[in-house]
Design a protein with these regions (language model features):
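Solvent-exposed loop/turn segments connecting transmembrane beta-strands
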Residues: 6-14, 40-48, 82-88, 115-124, ...
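Transmembrane beta-strands of outer-membrane beta-barrel pores
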Residues: 1-7, 36-42, 58-60, 74-80, ...
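Outer-membrane beta-barrel "beta-signal"
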Residues: 53, 129-132, 158-170
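Repeated loop/turn-to-beta-strand initiation elements of outer-membrane beta-barrel proteins
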Residues: 29-32, 64-68, 102-108, 131-141
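Detector for outer-membrane/organellar transmembrane beta-barrel domains
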Residues: 53, 59, 63-115
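Membrane-embedded beta-strand positions of outer-membrane beta-barrel proteins
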Residues: 1, 34-36, 70-72, 94, ...
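Outer-membrane beta-barrel proteins
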Residues: 21-28, 57-62, 78-80, 100-104, ...
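Membrane-embedded beta-strands of outer-membrane beta-barrel proteins
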Residues: 18-20, 54, 94-96, 127, ...
């Protein structure tokens, strides 16, 4: 993911993120996961944040119309503040993923992630409305709220942004 915004020629937002989560089912509704995330946000107070986590997930609802999963796990986080200070900490990770199929060609997604460490709590909420355009292309309207509980003085703890994007599904 890459997000940038400019107002009157001045950059007001610049964030990049990449991640991967692998799942291994061991019953119809239970699974183990391994996840890794990298985030770089110029205006968050953190130069970069990387996390690795393993844990357990449970599908509470899994029907043709909707799905709800919750996850919990443990891991590690490596962060670099904008002043160059490095922070390494263990984390507890929790997540929620909800999907509502509105029609054959549209759906609503709500994802929530929290990573609690000794030094910082990171949380992210992502609400998205996805509409199929043609073939594997879809239009996605999303609203994201990101929060770091411990940031340098003068930096906002919470960042919000709205995005309109085109998504290609495999």
């Amino acid at each position: 993911m890459a997000i940038t915004a400019r107002t009157n020629g001045v950059t007001t937002a610049e964030a990049y993120a990449a991640g991967y989560k692998g799942l291994r089912d061991f019953t119809e509704n239970s699974y183990l996961f391994a996840a890794g995330d990298w985030r770089q946000d110029r205006f968050s107070g953190y130069d970069k944040q990387m996390t690795e986590a393993i844990g357990y997930g449970r599908r509470l609802v899994d029907s043709a119309r909707q799905a709800l999963s919750v996850e919990g796990g443990i891991g590690a986080k490596q962060s670099t503040l904008i002043n160059g200070t490095d922070l390494d900490e263990g984390i507890v990770r929790g997540g929620l993923d909800y999907v509502l199929h509105i029609s054959e060609s549209s759906q609503f997604n709500q994802k929530f992630l929290i990573e609690q460490g000794d030094d910082n709590r990171y949380s992210e909420s992502n609400s998205a409305l996805k509409a199929k355009l043609v073939g594997n292309l879809a239009l996605v309207l999303s609203y994201v709220i990101k929060n770091n509980s411990d940031v340098p003085v003068g930096i906002a703890k919470t960042d919000r942004f709205t995005a309109i994007s085109i998504e290609y599904g495999f």
